[in-house]
């Protein structure tokens, strides 16, 4: 019953379980605060993650994240750690499991504090209520509490082991000498367990005894002060608690359940340089680091599943062997420091703990002992101890040294193991002998039954052999016929293989042709796409050019209209101003002549009045007046007539200038008409070019569509040819090759035509574009020359007008000087006449004075009228000259601006035409793709294949050949029989020899019944060997006939049935 319970419990735990890893971070201590160290560790208890900042303080990217089963931050209390980690494990210990909890980490990170804790200064706290108490006191308190509440009978034993400098010491030893070293042996009952010889296990009955034991062990444990920890543990300690619990089954059987809990407080790893350890302390630190390094290598080997795990390299790892990868439930508490000065050790501890998570243990419940077995074990132990005690008291026993005693104990253990092994082998062999004896008896009974059956079957066999002989003859005949058919089938198979190879070759050639068609199709599709894109681009470009030319035509028309209007306005203004100037001059001349005539007549009248005064004076006066009149007329004729003539000449010259301006306007109109005709013709040529390119591209597209339809037709015809190829082989192959070749030649010719049409389109586009460029350039040059000529003529006319105006000014000045001269001469004549009249007639002095005044007034009026006329004429001529200069200057500037604009338009048209040409060249040279020969298209060839099929001879002819072969080989039958049949041998020799093997050349084709019977009689020939022999016989069928081989097989069977094989051979 106990074995059943243990089996069921262990079956539930067959599946491995990972080691539980817990991380606890302590707060900052005084040393770290003095060093101004910052925190590099963040603990997230909810997400069970630890974040380590490996970079600078502000570096957010330099973080490493670790995930564990539980995470406790600096603020975590002792009771929280105990309830989360130890309470579930304690329940499993009470269930009968072996469990281990050990603390791992750097020195000074709180391992001993976590495992043992401290006593508060306030004595009112008990161990279980003390907030600073560790795992060990709380565990023991809860063990007694739980077992007492359940009313279970139990016993608790504790032991405290110290590992110092790779030596074992018992901290609970009753002897005052703590330096006694303990020895460790492998446990023969548990392959992964160890036995510590001389380790004291103390039975405790209540929690108070446990506390005294803890205090005694803590006092004996080796500690020392270093620079990093004032109370640094210099050794590893293993506190073991073994619980024996009594339970009663349903049947009333009393069982003892055993649970064991190992609480391990490891010494911390330390940096000797930082801890200040020297001499003895340095050796201690080296041994501690060595054992912890071995523990790390064991963890790494378990994680990586290496074949060798170095448990024996350290006493610590050897003790923890069952806890790491064994049948124990294990939990690791990794203690770390949050300070930046301990970053390297913290990262190392977290890496070890992270690797330890992957270790798989297979926990098993300890086997429960019955009360009788436990009492027996205790009784034997008591008797052994009594004997040892009596021998020690009486001193009549054997006393040995410890080394000899250990050697003797080792030999005894090894001999016990060998005895156990041999005992197990003897038991197994006895069981095997028993089974063999039973099998022998069964076989003997079966043999007797088989003998009886055999006698009955022999009679049936004799009857069956007669039928079998007849069947064999028929089978031999059928086999011969079948062999003939097989030969024919092989020949037909060879012929079919040749035909299939021919079909494979043709299929490869057809695949090459398909690839050629696909390449052609891909090239044509690419060219068609490029062709459509090119047509759209050319359409857009020519539309842009046409719109640009139309805009430029409109601009040129407006420019020429502006030139015409400007020149017309200038001519009208000049004509009106010249007419006004001529009328003003004529009016001035008429007013002067009228004034002079009036004054002269008035003077004559006045002089005639005085004629009576003195005839002589009258005569003299008349002479003087006549002389003065004649002189005045001559002066007017000689001085004023040339001026009037010059003004008239100036008027005619201005009208000639107007005619020249009209001629220039006519030239500008003709130039305008030339420009209109040029742009109209250029638009027509561009439109024609567009229509030609569209028609050419449409023809190319239609040719491409037809070519595409031809390719589709060729593909359909090709597939039909391939289908016909399978049925009619070579003839259809030749026909298909010829048709495919013709279609390819047709495709090539069409492709050549398409290429020629594209080439002609390219030439037409080049020709039309070059003509358009030349036409534009010639018209541009012509327009520039004509504009230059117009500008030169306008400048010449402006120069001639300027000279005319200057001449007019000179004539006006000359007229003014002539009038001044006449007035001076008149004044001189009047003075002389006055002197003569004064001398002649004093009485006419008053009259002369009045005449003098009158003449002076006349002179002054003539001067005023002439001066105002001259000023008016001069102002009008200057205004006319300035207006004409301004108009001509603006016209010249406008002509220059228009010339620059025409140059820009010419450059823009040239760029557009050049870009169109570049697009055409790139389309014809780069975008159009040619079918590049790959060299993989199959060539035309002839295919060799068999044309005749083998036919099997008729059945009658085959049977006649079979009978002839039987007659030919009858002589060789007797020799074969004599070699095959051997004399009987002795039974002893048969027992020594291996099983008989039949010669492969003797075995013939037999029925399934014969094969099974032969295998039974021979007793060692495997079925596949006979199949192999039969295969060989089929290959060498031409050497011996089937009938003779069947007879030989019968002889061999008879010889084999007569042999007396032992029973072992038959079985």
UniProtKB/Swiss-Prot annotation:
Enumerate the spans annotated as Kinesin motor domain.
18-359
Gene Ontology MF annotations: ATP binding; microtubule binding; microtubule motor activity; plus-end-directed microtubule motor activity; protein kinase binding
Q: Which CDD domains match?
A: KISc_BimC_Eg5 (cd01364)
Alphabetical GO CC annotations of the entry are: centrosome; cytoplasm; mitotic spindle; nucleus; spindle microtubule; spindle pole
How this protein is processed and modified after translation, per its record? Phosphorylation of Thr-937 during mitosis controls the association of this protein with the spindle apparatus.
Matching InterPro entries:
KIF11-like (IPR047149), KIF11-like_kin_motor_dom (IPR047241), Kinesin-assoc_MT-bd_dom (IPR025901), Kinesin_motor_CS (IPR019821), Kinesin_motor_dom (IPR001752), Kinesin_motor_dom_sf (IPR036961), P-loop_NTPase (IPR027417)
Name the organs or tissues of expression.
In unfertilized eggs, shows highest expression in the germinal vesicle and radial yolk-poor channels. Also present in testis.
Alphabetical UniProt keywords = ATP-binding, Cell cycle, Cell division, Coiled coil, Cytoplasm, Cytoskeleton, Microtubule, Mitosis, Motor protein, Nucleotide-binding, Phosphoprotein
Gene3D superfamilies (UniProt xref): Kinesin motor domain
Annotated compartments: Cytoplasm; Cytoplasm, Cytoskeleton, Spindle pole
Indicate yes or no for the key word Transcription regulation: no
**Where ATP is bound, by residue?**
105-112
Q: Which family does it belong to?
A: Belongs to the TRAFAC class myosin-kinesin ATPase superfamily. Kinesin family. BimC subfamily.
On this chain, the residues bearing Phosphothreonine are 937
UniProt name for this protein? Kinesin-like protein KIF11-B
Which residues are in coiled coils?
A: 365-480
């Amino acid at each position: 019953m106990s074995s059943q319970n243990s089996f069921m419990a262990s079956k539930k735990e067959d599946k491995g379980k990972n080691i539980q890893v817990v991380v606890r971070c302590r707060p900052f201590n005084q040393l770290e605060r003095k060093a101004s160290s910052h925190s590099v560790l963040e603990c997230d208890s909810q997400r069970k993650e630890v974040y380590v900042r490996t970079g600078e303080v502000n570096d957010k990217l330099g973080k490493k994240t670790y995930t564990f089963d539980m995470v406790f931050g600096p603020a975590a209390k002792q009771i929280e750690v105990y309830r989360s980690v130890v309470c579930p494990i304690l329940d499993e210990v009470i269930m009968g499991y072996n469990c281990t909890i050990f603390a791992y980490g750097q020195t000074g990170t709180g391992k001993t504090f976590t495992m043992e804790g401290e006593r508060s200064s306030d004595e009112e706290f008990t161990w279980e209520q003390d907030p600073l108490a560790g795992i060990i006191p709380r565990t023991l308190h809860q063990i007694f509490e739980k077992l007492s509440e359940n009313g279970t009978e139990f016993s608790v034993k504790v032991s405290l082991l110290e590992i110092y400098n790779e030596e074992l010491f018992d901290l609970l030893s009753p002897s005052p000498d703590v330096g006694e070293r303990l020895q460790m042996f492998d446990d023969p009952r548990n392959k992964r367990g160890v036995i510590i010889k001389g380790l004291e296990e103390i039975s405790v009955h209540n929690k108070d005894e446990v506390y005294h034991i803890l205090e005694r062990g803590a006092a004996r444990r080796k500690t020392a002060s270093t620079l990093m920890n004032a109370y640094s543990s210099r050794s590893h300690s293993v506190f073991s608690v073994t619980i024996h619990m009594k339970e009663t089954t349903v049947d009333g059987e009393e069982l003892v359940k055993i649970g064991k809990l190992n609480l391990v407080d490891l010494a911390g790893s330390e940096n000797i340089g930082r801890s200040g350890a020297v001499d003895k302390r340095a050796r201690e630190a080296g041994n501690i680091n060595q054992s912890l390094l071995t523990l790390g290598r064991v963890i790494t080997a378990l994680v990586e599943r290496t074949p060798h795990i170095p448990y024996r390299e350290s006493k610590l790892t050897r003790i923890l062997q069952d806890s790491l990868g064994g049948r124990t439930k294990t939990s690791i508490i990794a203690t770390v420091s949050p300070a930046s000065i301990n970053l390297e050790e913290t990262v190392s501890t977290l890496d070890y703990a992270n690797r330890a998570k992957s270790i798989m243990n297979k926990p098993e419940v300890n086997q429960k002992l019955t009360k009788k077995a436990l009492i027996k074990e205790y009784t034997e132990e008591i008797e052994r101890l009594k004997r040892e005690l009596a021998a020690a008291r009486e001193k009549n026993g054997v006393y040995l040294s410890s080394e000899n005693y250990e050697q003797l104990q080792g030999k005894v253990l090894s001999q016990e193991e060998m005895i156990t092994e041999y005992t197990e082998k003897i038991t197994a062999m006895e069981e095997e002998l028993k089974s063999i004896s039973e099998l022998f008896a069964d076989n003997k009974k079966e043999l007797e039954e088989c003998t009886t059956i055999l006698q009955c079957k022999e009679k049936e066999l004799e009857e069956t052999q007669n039928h079998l002989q007849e069947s064999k003859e028929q089978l031999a005949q059928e086999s011969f016929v079948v062999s003939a058919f097989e030969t024919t089938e092989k020949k037909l198979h060879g012929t079919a293989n040749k035909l299939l190879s021919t079909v494979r070759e043709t299929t490869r050639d057809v695949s090459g042709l398909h690839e050629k068609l696909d390449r052609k199709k891909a090239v044509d599709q690419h060219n068609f796409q490029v062709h459509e894109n090119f047509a759209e681009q050319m359409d857009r470009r020519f539309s842009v050019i046409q719109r640009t030319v139309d805009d430029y035509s409109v601009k040129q028309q407006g420019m020429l209209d502006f030139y015409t209007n400007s020149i017309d306005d200038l001519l009208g203004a000049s004509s009106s101003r010249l007419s006004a100037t001529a009328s003003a001059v004529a009016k001035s001349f008429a007013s002067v002549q009228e004034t002079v005539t009036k004054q002269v007549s008035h003077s004559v009248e006045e002089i005639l009045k005085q004629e009576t005064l003195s005839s002589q004076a009258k005569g003299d006066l008349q002479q003087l007046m006549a002389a003065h009149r004649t002189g005045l007329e001559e002066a007017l004729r000689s001085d004023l007539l040339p001026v009037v003539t010059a003004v008239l000449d100036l008027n005619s010259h201005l009208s000639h200038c107007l005619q020249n301006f009209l001629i220039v306007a006519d030239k500008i109109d003709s130039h305008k008409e030339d420009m209109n005709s040029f742009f109209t013709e250029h638009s027509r040529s561009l439109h024609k070019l567009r229509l030609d390119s569209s028609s050419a591209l449409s023809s190319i597209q239609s040719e491409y569509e037809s070519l595409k339809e031809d390719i589709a037709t060729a593909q359909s015809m090709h597939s039909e040819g391939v289908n016909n190829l399978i049925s009619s082989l070579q003839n259809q192959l030749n026909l298909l090759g010829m048709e495919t070749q013709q279609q390819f030649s047709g495709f090539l010719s069409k492709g050549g035509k398409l290429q020629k049409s594209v080439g002609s389109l390219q030439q037409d586009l080049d020709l039309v574009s070059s003509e358009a460029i030349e036409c534009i350039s010639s018209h541009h040059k012509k327009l520039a020359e004509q504009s230059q000529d117009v500008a030169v003529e306008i400048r010449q006319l402006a120069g001639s007008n300027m000279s005319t105006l200057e001449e007019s000014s000179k004539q006006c000045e000359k007229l003014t000087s002539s009038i001044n001269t006449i007035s001076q001469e008149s004044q001189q004549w009047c003075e002389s006449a006055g002197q003569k009249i004064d001398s002649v007639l004093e009485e006419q002095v008053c009259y002369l004075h009045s005449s003098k005044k009158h003449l002076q007034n006349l002179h002054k009026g003539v001067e005023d009228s002439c001066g105002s006329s001259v000023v008016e004429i001069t102002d009008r001529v200057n205004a006319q000259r300035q207006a004409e200069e301004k108009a001509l200057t603006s016209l010249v500037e406008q002509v220059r601006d228009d010339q620059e604009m025409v140059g820009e338009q010419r450059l823009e048209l040239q760029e557009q035409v050049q870009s169109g040409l570049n697009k055409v060249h790139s389309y014809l040279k780069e975008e159009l793709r040619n079918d590049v020969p790959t060299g993989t298209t199959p060539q035309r060839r002839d295919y060799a294949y068999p044309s005749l099929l083998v036919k099997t001879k008729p059945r009658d002819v085959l049977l006649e050949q079979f009978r002839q072969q039987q007659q030919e080989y009858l002589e060789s039958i007797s020799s074969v029989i004599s070699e095959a049949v051997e004399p009987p041998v002795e039974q002893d020799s048969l027992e020594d020899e291996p099983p008989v093997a039949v010669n492969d050349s003797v075995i013939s084709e037999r029925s399934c019944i014969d094969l099974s019977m032969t295998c039974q009689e021979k007793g060692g020939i495997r079925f596949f060997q006979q199949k192999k022999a039969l295969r060989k016989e089929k290959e060498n069928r031409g050497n011996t006939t089937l009938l003779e081989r069947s007879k030989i097989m019968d002889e061999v069977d008879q010889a084999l049935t007569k042999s007396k094989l032992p029973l072992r051979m038959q079985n």
